[in-house]
Amino acid sequence: MRSGWNEVRSIAEEQWGLVTKRQIEKTGIAWSTVSRQVGIGGLERVAHGVYRLRGGAEPEHLALRAAWLQLAPEAAVWERRPEQGVVSHRSAAHLYGIGHLAADSHEFTLPRRKQTRREDVWLHRGDVGDCWVQLRGLPVTKPSRIAADLLAGHEDPG
C-alpha cells in the first residue's frame, strides 16, 4: 500500500497539498485506512470529499480551492479543462483584488447546469470561452469578464 500513498502524495504535491476522495480511491487505498489517517492527523478533511495532507503549510484560499476540486473530484488539477469550472464573479474579483465586494461564497462558471448542496457555493451557467487565465494555480475569469458578470448580476464591481 506504500505505492498508493506515494501516488496520493504525488497528486497532493501538485494540488496545494489537497486530494479528493475519488483520487484516493483510484490508488486502491482502503477507505478504512483513509479514516484512520484522518483520526491520527495525517489527513485533514477540509470539505466533503476533499482532504489536506498534514505537514505542509496551509495553502491560501483553501476553501475556494477545495470547492473547485469538488466540481470534478476525479480529475487532477493538471487534467482539468475550463468546462469543469472557472472561478468567476466575486470570487474572481477577490483573487485579483478588484473592488470591495465580499467574497463570502465561492462562485464558478460552467457551460452546463450543475448542482451543489453547498450553501456557500454558487454555480453560474455560461461559456467563458477564452476569457479566463490561470491565476494562483486556478482557472479564473479575466477582469473584463468579471466586470461583465457582476454588472449582469446588478452588482457594482467598483
Task: Spell out what each predicted region is.
Residues M1-G158:
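Short gly/ser-rich loop at a beta-strand->alpha-helix junction or flexible surface loop bordering the NTP-binding
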